[in-house]
């Protein structure tokens, strides 16, 4: 027989946070401790992928990529990539009990780019190893996001004007990869950070 047990279904973004949405960093670890104290066995978190329009966890760009909005901004301070004042400047005085994805999109990405500009040589080496370990999906994902968000301004794939890119012609992909190298590396960095926060929460 199975032992009777119970748990909670809640997406990570629903956790209270001073930074717009709950994250897989400190807020998730505190919630896990709360569940343990309440003698709960399970936390069903729902998908944690990189969401698109509407921010639905069931409409993601990748089955493997994490959602950058779930990065704990305080952890970026601990890693030395942002200052506490910079993180506070990105807050929008919203209630910690309300998720506002539109304002989050306006405030979070400039901070992510600032953090990326401060990556250390040691972290670059770790990111290179991470990229190699995830070569089956990460480079394609990062290229796709750079194309969609930067080159084609969030247009759906069928509206991309360059047919050879839409059709994934090798010479076209090589061209846009070179053109968007900085944007691709930025998105790989975000996925590396996503791995760090996921590992921290899993250790709980």
Where do the PLM segments sit?
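Active-site-proximal, well-structured secondary-structure segments within enzyme catalytic domains
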Residues: 83-196
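Acidic, His- and aromatic-enriched active-site or binding-groove loops in soluble protein domains
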Residues: 60-82
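Short, solvent-exposed turn/loop segments enriched in Gly/Ser/Thr/Pro and often Arg
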Residues: 44-54
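N-terminal small/glycine-rich loop or linker at the start of catalytic domains
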Residues: 1-19, 173
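Short, acidic/polar
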Residues: 24-32
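Conserved, mostly hydrophobic/aromatic
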Residues: 35, 45, 144
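Short acidic/polar active-site loop segments enriched in Thr and Asp
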Residues: 41
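Conserved small/polar residues in nucleotide/adenosyl-binding loops
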Residues: 197-202
């Amino acid at each position: 027989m199975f032992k009777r047990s119970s748990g909670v279904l809640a997406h990570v973004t629903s956790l209270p946070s001073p930074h717009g949405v709950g994250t897989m960093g400190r807020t998730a670890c505190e919630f896990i401790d709360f569940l343990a104290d309440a003698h709960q066995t399970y936390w069903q978190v729902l998908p944690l992928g990189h969401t698109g329009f509407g921010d639905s966890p069931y409409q993601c760009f990748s089955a493997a990529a994490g959602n950058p909005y779930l990065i704990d901004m305080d952890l970026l301070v601990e890693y030395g990539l942002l200052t506490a004042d910079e993180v506070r400047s990105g807050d929008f005085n919203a209630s910690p009990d309300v998720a506002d994805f539109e304002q989050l999109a306006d405030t979070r990405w400039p901070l992510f780019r600032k953090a990326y500009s401060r990556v250390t040589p040691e972290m670059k080496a770790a990111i290179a190893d991470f990229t190699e370990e995830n070569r089956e999906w990460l480079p394609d994902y990062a290229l796709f996001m750079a194309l969609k968000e930067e080159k084609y301004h969030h247009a759906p794939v069928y509206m991309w004007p360059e047919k050879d890119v839409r059709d994934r012609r090798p010479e076209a992909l090589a061209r846009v990869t070179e053109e968007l190298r900085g944007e691709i590396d930025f998105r790989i960095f975000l996925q590396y950070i996503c791995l760090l926060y996921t590992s921290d929460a899993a250790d709980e």
